[in-house]
Every structure is written in C-alpha cells, then in structure tokens.
Amino acid sequence: MSTPSPLTRDGFIQAQDAIAQAAEEKAAQRQHAKKKLTARERLSLFFDDGVWHEVGQFIGGSVRAGRIGSAVAAGYGRVQGRMVAAYAQDFSVLGGTLGKVEGDKIVDLIDRGIRMRIPIVGIQDSGGARIQEGVVALAQYGRIFKKTCEASGLVPQISIILGPCAGGAVYQPALTDFIVMTRENSHMFVTGPDVVAATTGEKVTLDELGGAAIHNFQSGVAHHMADTEEEAIDYVRSLLDYLPSSCEVAPPKYEYIPNPEDEAAARAVAELVPTSVRQPYDVRDVVRSLVDHGEYVEIQDLFAPNVTIGFACVDGQSVGIVANQPMNDAGTLDVDASEKAARFVRFCDAFGLPIVTFVDVPGYRPGTEQEQAGIIRRGAKVIVAYANATVPMVTVILRKAYGGAYIVMGSKSIGADLAFAWPDAQIAVMGAEGAASIMYRRELAAARENGTFEEMKAELVARYEEETVNPEVSVSSGQLDGIIAPADTRQTIIDSLHLLATKDQRAPHVKRHDNGPL
C-alpha cells in the first residue's frame, strides 16, 4: 500500500495505523475462514477489557514499505488487575513460522517478564522453523528454550496451543508450567504424519499423532482440553487467579466472607464418603465441599484420573490440592498418577502455594505392566516432590492409607507439617483382609480343613482392624496430629494454614540441586 513520502510525524502515525489495520483485516480473513481467531484477537480476549500494549509491532517490517513486522504479536496487559506478559504467533504471516526476528521478539518478551517478575503466556500457532532461514531459525529455538528454563520456577509460564506446534517447537511449551489445548485445532508432535509414514511406514492422522485428545488422555503433555479458543483463554485467566506473579511474592489472598452454603457443605462432607473401603466415590465432591464457594479448578482432569490435582481457596488463601480418586482404579498410584502429582507438588512448592492433600489410597497398582513401566523410578518422584517441599503442607486421611502409597502421599514422615485422619480411617501396611491372610496363614489353613474358614477369617480381620488399622495407633506414635470429625475438616485446614503462615520456607541445606529420578 502507498504511504506518505516523505513521512511527517503525523503521516508516520497514520501510515503505521493503516498498515496495522490492513494486516489485521488480512489475518482475519485467513483465520476466520478456518474458524480461528487472529493473534491479536486472541491477546485482546486474554487481557482485561481487551486492553493491552503491543511492543515491537514493526520489528522486521517497514512503515515506508507498507509492511508489518514479524509473525509474532507481543505485549503487556492486565489479567484480573495484575500485569502479565504475553505473545501470540501469527499464522497469517508466513504460516507463523519462526525466524530470527520472531525468536528475538519471544526471547525479549520472556526476558522482560523475568525482569518485571510477571507471568508469561505464549499462544502457539506456527508451522515451525522458517526453512528459508536455516540454522539461524533453529538457533532461535535454542535461545527460547534457554530463556524459558531461566524463567522456570521464577515466574508462572503457561502455553496455549491454538494451532500446529511441531518439531523442535514443541519443547518450548513442554518447558512451561501448564499447556492448554483446544479439542479440534490444536496439534503437537515432534515428527509429522508424512515423516512418520516415510520412516516407519505407519500411516496416522494429525489427531492420532498429536491431537488434543492424545495429549490430554494418554501422553499427559497437556493440562486442559477446551472446546473453543475462548474457553481455553478463559481457563488460563482462571489459573492465573490462584498464582502469584512470581516466586518472590506471596500467593493471592482474597477476602472471604463466611456463608451458609459453605458451612452446610463442610458439615455434610461425611455423607459423600461411603464407610466401606471398597465403595467408590468422587473425591472432587469432597474437595468442593471443603473449599471456598465450592470452586475447584482441576488440572489434567483427563490424564491419570486416579489422582486429582488443582487449585482452590480456603478462607481466601490460594492452595494446591492433591487427592486420590477412588472413582478411578480405586485411587491406586501408578506411574502416570505419580508423575502427575509429583510435578504439581513441585510447582506449588516453587511458587509458595500451600499444599492440602486428601488421602484415600489402597497402595500402588500391582502387575508386570507397572514394574516394566518403571514404577520404582517414576513413583519415587512423588517422594522427591513432597520431601523437598518447604511450603505449608496439611494432609487429611479420609478413609484408607495403606503401605508405601500412604507414606508418599504427603504423610507426616515425609514432610507434612500437620496430618489428620477421620475416625474411621484405616492406616496400615496393608488392608485387613490381606494382612490377616498372611499373618494367620496356618490358622486359616486349619480352619479351611475343618469347615470354619469364613468364621475364622472374619474374626481375624475384625481383630486386625481393631488393633492395627485404626488411626489411634498413628496418633499415639506421633504420625498423626489428631483424629478429627469430618464436619470439622474445613475448619481444621483453615486453622492449620493460619498456624503455618509464618513457616520458614528456606531450604535446609545449600547445594546446587538434588539428583532425583527425573
């Protein structure tokens, strides 16, 4: 398009605005035809009231030549009143591919986020490295990876995948704290379908290789699957409500006014948990009954559902929640659930979020599949996470806690500051039936021969439950800080968090880093 020449100051501003408007109209035509928003529409939707300040819009472009800049839009704005840095790849410009200019803009934005100590959000929609720029484009990925690692644990980083994210580009979102995808248009993979077919002979579709369902249900790469772009962006805004701007400031604390609904839900929480340890229930209902306004933002709800993790507020204090889920695989721990819980605990610890753990676990999932999948190495990650955490940690045993799984689920011996149990909780090396079968093998064998097996087993199981699996043993030995009535659970958690508010969260030893089982 033509621009005033020579450009006066007023003419320059007018030309700049005209070029930007023309570029956005072109982007809208291309993206809307695919039922996708433009990069700048996405950022406007993300920031409060659509207000944000773009930086470097014409880097790599030319106002005189009538050409807008790179395939990345970047800037700053407020989310729920707090400053956040964000960028969005622009697929309407050279397929959103990344070259030197795009890499420089992303690195610069992350670097500013680090210096300003504010969260960083990246919206991915790119064809990958710009082939024409060769190794220069690849080197930019290395710079982005390094800068993302530098920001990790310092400021929250969230990725939203709203288009393709392929090749080496996938590792930048993987280095961030949370990844959100949309059901239809989001794809992440290291090698595309054509390369897979050429090298292995396997024919797969984009969805089969790296669609949102794959990464939310199976791989665990993603943390949430939204139906629309708007829902994905809104979910990220909700996440940020619970997170501090950086590790150097306290997590959000909101004014909470007690209300009859929360009080009634807390009093009735026992009704949600069956007394039989074999009967399933949805532990998320328990969580919602104990947190403010029943609001619980779950993370990775589709992956490893035998453990649930997420954020909530208790008396206005933002906390991380970890809980076994009896609705799925009886709440057992397996390789996926272990890694899911471990990384979440590490995140909470990095950003000073207190951790509330609800335990109802029968043990680790048995079988050759789990052993071959590395349950020893991968299960140990939960130990590392809880044992190294220095944030306030409160644990409540709801119904059962058996064996090694009890120990790793935020027990007092592994680092919980305060641990409680409901009166009917069973805490032991294993369940009563299994223990009785081992401890009284000979007696039961004799009873089987004389026809009194069932009566004998029932008697031995009852004896074991009375003498061993009740929480009194744990209280008397100091493994629990108290047995509480279910109706008092919420208030107990509130009182515990108030007590732990001044906890010294400094690491006990100075060292480079631990060498846990990554």
Predicted regions and their residues:
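Ligand-binding clefts of soluble mixed alpha/beta catalytic domains
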Residues: 1-518
